[in-house]
């Protein structure tokens, strides 16, 4: 079996991939199940975001990974599944079984629900908003989640402008005292 750090990383990657699935990075990628085409939460930076101290979950990640593998062993036993002993238990589950286990861990009434939901939210945030990066930096790097949602690069001055109004009309004129940076005077 791998080192504790490798077990933690692959387990958390498998959890992130369960939340926002993506394609395998390489043929023998066990953490990413390959359940969806294109990049998912892992490629979008889920582990980078989870290891950002501002999330408040960083200190608990080793415990969460260990707990997730324990839950996976129990799940496998309850469902008469044989797990590959060379992999962390959660990583060894199929995508369908990972999803079923995460669904039970995040269900109303589960005593650990808050922790698993928090972890899921940060995995989503890594894909949906690139919360671990400045938006312009993420766009310049080709962040997969932002690109999938249609974000475009800012103008040369770093500001986003939209030539077409969402309601097909300008809702308000810019206040005459607005500064060049867009701030009110």
Where are these regions (language model features)?
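Long, amphipathic alpha-helical surface segments
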Residues: 109-185
């Amino acid at each position: 079996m791998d080192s504790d750090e490798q077990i933690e990383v692959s387990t958390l990657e498998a959890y992130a991939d369960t939340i926002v699935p993506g394609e395998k990075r390489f043929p023998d990628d066990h953490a990413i199940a390959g359940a969806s085409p294109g990049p998912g939460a892992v490629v979008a930076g889920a582990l980078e975001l989870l290891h950002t101290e501002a999330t408040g979950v960083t200190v608990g990640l080793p415990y969460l990974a260990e707990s997730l593998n324990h839950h996976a062993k129990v799940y496998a036993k309850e469902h008469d599944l044989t797990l590959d002993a060379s992999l962390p238990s959660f990583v060894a589950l199929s995508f369908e079984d990972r999803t079923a286990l995460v669904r039970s861990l995040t269900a109303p009434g589960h005593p650990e629900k808050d922790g698993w939901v928090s972890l899921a939210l940060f995995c989503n945030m890594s894909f949906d908003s690139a919360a671990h990066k400045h938006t312009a930096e993420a766009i310049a790097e080709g962040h997969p989640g932002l690109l999938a949602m249609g974000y475009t690069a800012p103008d040369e001055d770093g500001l986003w402008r939209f030539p077409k109004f969402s309601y097909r009309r300008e809702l308000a004129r810019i206040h005459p005292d607005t500064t060049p940076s867009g701030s009110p005077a």
